[in-house]
């Protein structure tokens, strides 16, 4: 779809959506997004130019269907997939991708760390994906030197980052905000550093006693990104891994640096979103969102959860969806899903489904609470179908039609019950919607009550 759009841009020094927007040019991607979001193309261009909205769209990801992440657009959901040294199969990861897209993932991150050829699994995922693909390049940087921190050089990081860009990765988590002077602030935490990328860079800085190379070479990374229109997802290496550690000095020190880096990327006209926690008590979620907006000049916020309890292994998709709905309501632009396997193991296909649906609910609830135009239309349509006992329409409008039909059919599987004016909960005699009290009857009752001087 995008080949004809991209062709005139080839060979230019800066092909980012932000660069075009700041020069007053509405790209085909901006037009496409405007139609999807039911917003004016001019508004999309203005928000991209301002940095409040991003369109992750690498020029080498030709089968991408562009989408937007930002306060002006719908709240989005990311799904994580990826092979590990203990569980790895390229075909399985491609199937997870397809399942994630089927159940509404707006973007997908390939977090593969080993067990397969990382370039091959990434390429297979990009070739099959109509949604933006994100990666964490430091994983492959470490894998490229067989896990040996002492052999890992600054140039190794940049080489892998450019390789991901060349393959068509739309956004990369770059852990550039973690500085060597932040590390002592981790003392006193219960769970320390829980970011894999952050952990790698912390080890590198401690071993070499040098500043974070992703920070010192940040302008070089910007030069790479603007050649491909790859978007920064600035990683929060010091995100809290438990409620005790939330909103501490370490987290907020890194956030301040992420704000600095956001503005440095914008100087290169490179798109940015900023990653956030993590594990956060409900009463601190609004503070975290507001603080990010303040420090990072309203760049789109992308949060993992946050989980609002630490005692829900096996059900962390529920604990985190509560926090995600609140974060979305307060202005977070994208929610990274959490599956039931969080903290326990690598998710399988069913875990991907469970996590995604939980987060589609959270994002949708946030859009309704923020009064986005048309956000509640589908809910109202389903409610009409429910009142009219149109079971097939209810299934069709559900976030997970297969699951809705499955649960209904467990007790009333015959086709005749698709027209029945009851379900197995109340049965045919006790459903309150079965009585269908007419508006005319209610008007007559109101008139009679008024005649009796009864307040209504």
Curated annotation (Swiss-Prot):
Any idea of its EC number? 4.1.99.17
Q: Which organism is it from?
A: Prochlorococcus marinus (strain AS9601)
Task: Output the superkingdom of the source species.
Answer: Bacteria
Q: Which cofactor does it need?
A: [4Fe-4S] cluster
| HAMAP family per UniProt | ThiC
- The keyword Iron belongs to this UniProt entry's keyword annotation: yes
Keyword entries, A-Z: 4Fe-4S, Iron, Iron-sulfur, Lyase, Metal-binding, S-adenosyl-L-methionine, Thiamine biosynthesis, Zinc
- Could you tell me what this protein is called? Phosphomethylpyrimidine synthase
Q: Which GO terms describe its biological process?
A: thiamine biosynthetic process; thiamine diphosphate biosynthetic process
Pathway(s) this gene product operates in, as recorded in its UniProt entry: Cofactor biosynthesis; thiamine diphosphate biosynthesis
For this chain's record, the cofactor binding note is: Binds 1 [4Fe-4S] cluster per subunit. The cluster is coordinated with 3 cysteines and an exchangeable S-adenosyl-L-methionine.
Question: Tell me, what does this protein do in biology?
Answer: Catalyzes the synthesis of the hydroxymethylpyrimidine phosphate (HMP-P) moiety of thiamine from aminoimidazole ribotide (AIR) in a radical S-adenosyl-L-methionine (SAM)-dependent reaction.
Gene Ontology molecular-function annotations: 4 iron, 4 sulfur cluster binding; carbon-carbon lyase activity; zinc ion binding
Q: Which of this chain's residues are annotated to bind [4Fe-4S] cluster?
A: 423, 426, 431
Q: State one Pfam family annotation.
A: ThiC_Rad_SAM
Which family, according to UniProt? Belongs to the ThiC family.
Sites where the protein binds substrate:
80, 109, 139, 175, 195-197, 236-239, 275, 302
Name the residues that bind Zn(2+): 279, 343
Q: What is the lineage of its organism?
A: Bacteria, Bacillati, Cyanobacteriota, Cyanophyceae, Synechococcales
> One GO CC term of this entry?
cytosol
Reaction equation(s) it catalyzes: 5-amino-1-(5-phospho-beta-D-ribosyl)imidazole + S-adenosyl-L-methionine = 4-amino-2-methyl-5-(phosphooxymethyl)pyrimidine + CO + 5'-deoxyadenosine + formate + L-methionine + 3 H(+)
